[in-house]
Amino acid sequence: MQKLHREICGPVGLVPTMGYLHEGHLSLIRASKKQDLNTVASIFVNPTQFGPHEDFKKYPRDEKRDMAMLENAGVDYVFAPSVEEMYPPGFDSWVEPGVLQERLEGAVRPGHFRGVCTVVAKLFTIICPAKAYFGQKDYQQYLIIKKMASDLNLDVSVEMLPIVRESDGLALSSRNTYLSASERKAALVLYRSLLTAKSLFAAKEYNPEIIRRKMTEEIQRESLAEIDYVSLSDQDTLGEADKVSIKTIALVAARFGKTRLIDNMFLA
């Protein structure tokens, strides 16, 4: 792939994925192509970002389907390495993020962002993109990768695009395929809780305790939902907000049966 990069004329746009693509991924590809970049999509289910009791083995995979979608989307190149290629025997060098990983997903999934940063740093090194595209749904991941690129002087612009949702508001996720019909219906409560926060802020409610409580109560009304966290965080630091403002982002995570989903929304 590094040899191939030297043969590509012009800057590269990278869309890193774990496969089982959906419209959210395709929106990232369209953003890259709109900027006249040679667009590379990577497909790699990264084992090092999964915990020992998480869903690495059952994570949905369908390479034939993904390749057809990428071809239809006009992707110029696909990088789909094996685990052995990315982590050869004896591999023992890691990118460890700092304080941005300590809350939210990092607290619930220890070691997750070390795996994410390591694999993304390797992708940046292999593919040498001018721009890399990530979705807002994984907002903490986006901030951490952007910080990593800046701290390590990686010559890549890390871009974020808005969450793509189903018509009823459910954020698109490859893991949605795990949901039963009743769990999928229940999962809409995450979106409703975020709308509750946004509505309260629009009505000039700036007390984070009140907004968090209302969000939590909304989710708790759904019997199939098991809350991991409800947060009102600073958009830049991810510190919990003392007062809600235009710089606040609401983030939620919950489990529906065996499926864990996350979502977020800017309040302004």
Curated annotation (Swiss-Prot):
Cellular-component GO terms for this entry: cytosol
One of the record's GO molecular function terms: pantoate-beta-alanine ligase activity
Subunit structure: Homodimer.
Recorded name of the encoding gene: panC
GO terms classed as biological process: pantothenate biosynthetic process
Extra remark beyond the main annotation: The reaction proceeds by a bi uni uni bi ping pong mechanism.
Residue positions binding beta-alanine: Q49
InterPro entries attached to this UniProt entry: Pantoate_ligase, Pantoate_ligase_C, Rossmann-like_a/b/a_fold
Protein name: Pantothenate synthetase
CDD domains per record: PanC
